[in-house]
Curated annotation (Swiss-Prot):
Residues involved in NAD(+) binding: 183-187, 206, 271-274
Entry EC number(s): 1.8.1.4
One GO BP: 2-oxoglutarate metabolic process
GO MF annotation list: dihydrolipoyl dehydrogenase (NADH) activity; flavin adenine dinucleotide binding
This protein's record includes keyword Oxidoreductase: yes
Cited function: Lipoamide dehydrogenase is a component of the alpha-ketoacid dehydrogenase complexes.
Organism superkingdom: Bacteria
Cystine pairs: 47-52
Subunit: Homodimer.
Positions that bind FAD: 39-47, 56, 119, 314, 322
Cofactor entry: FAD
Protein known as: Dihydrolipoyl dehydrogenase
Naturally occurring in which organism (per UniProt): Staphylococcus aureus (strain Mu50 / ATCC 700699)
Amino acid sequence: MVVGDFPIETDTIVIGAGPGGYVAAIRAAQLGQKVTIVEKGNLGGVCLNVGCIPSKALLHASHRFVEAQHSENLGVIAESVSLNFQKVQEFKSSVVNKLTGGVEGLLKGNKVNIVKGEAYFVDNNSLRVMDEKSAQTYNFKNAIIATGSRPIEIPNFKFGKRVIDSTGALNLQEVPGKLVVVGGGYIGSELGTAFANFGSEVTILEGAKDILGGFEKQMTQPVKKGMKEKGVEIVTEAMAKSAEETDNGVKVTYEAKGEEKTIEADYVLVTVGRRPNTDELGLEELGVKFADRGLLEVDKQSRTSISNIYAIGDIVPGLPLAHKASYEAKVAAEAIDGQAAEVDYIGMPAVCFTEPELATVGYSEAQAKEEGLAIKASKFPYAANGRALSLDDTNGFVKLITLKEDDTLIGAQVVGTGASDIISELGLAIEAGMNAEDIALTIHAHPTLGEMTMEAAEKAIGYPIHTM
């Protein structure tokens, strides 16, 4: 404590107000804690401000732009369709502002004290919060660290005017004529798709043998096919070597198949992963144990090696997903309350908003076989679903992974429009230990895309109606 600085007492202090932090603060407050949340930027964190939400707004606008140009088969003929990208950005910002304002209202409604500034730990029971004008010490009984992550900057690709990260891409004020994307993961693939829809000439440079490495090849094939139809060039096993800004753009040098090549573009978007924000918090001095790559070690209650300090979200091992952070947030808050809550990721989905959408939960077919499990894989195609046909969008499938012995659902994959929504039912089924018959006997509304989970389940038990 600094002389003259009177510390403020609080039960639980949360550092970071993203989808992990603000959820943790609200749940802790609901459980009777006096809660303070510290945020150095905007409430909502990366997800609401420069991540999940604005990227989906841009993607939605890009879909509408494409649909306006290509709906002749539906009898909708639009001539001279144009794009006002400034309006697109205004729409994106309006969505972000509504949600961030909503988060502030929820925090205040739950009597959470909101503090703006940067925090670092003084000891196991106090931290210092500083802004541009002042500093304040807070004493706490428990702390939850939810500081998220930031884009990785790779050698010779220093972020600037033309070399941008995902935040820069989301805030562009023009549609690039040419865009190079370094990294073919979900961020690069989603943003590459959006700008291709807006009219950019997109090249994706991926260092691995394939893009979207977190998904099965069977799932990514339709995505790659769709990208190529949009004119997106995908270069795999490509090593990005340097980016040199020019007067009007950027020159990217990369190596592929032993040959060095260059490509000129208006911008290069670097999406090669994210780094946890665990530095500059004073954690090393406290003796908090770290895992690999700057992540923090935690137990099943999200507790670090220091018993009253918890960590959630992108700063702990596992996929950097907003819904994972929110889930861990509730577990941490309930653990502080003395409950026996523990994390269990068995029903946690992962989604990618490409075209078509990708979603997976539990075991993939390959993972189950690698573990020596005796399984069945049962697929139902979008092309056999009435709702998909009426939407003129039949590219995709629903696949269930069940155990041969009792048809218990242990995994599911969905490719196609609405996959990100369909997967939730299948995650619930896995979480509840349901088998294929449980899903098959559940009456699903007709005509809906959700019926395909029932159809795939009927195939799993050997009695398919609308497929052979």
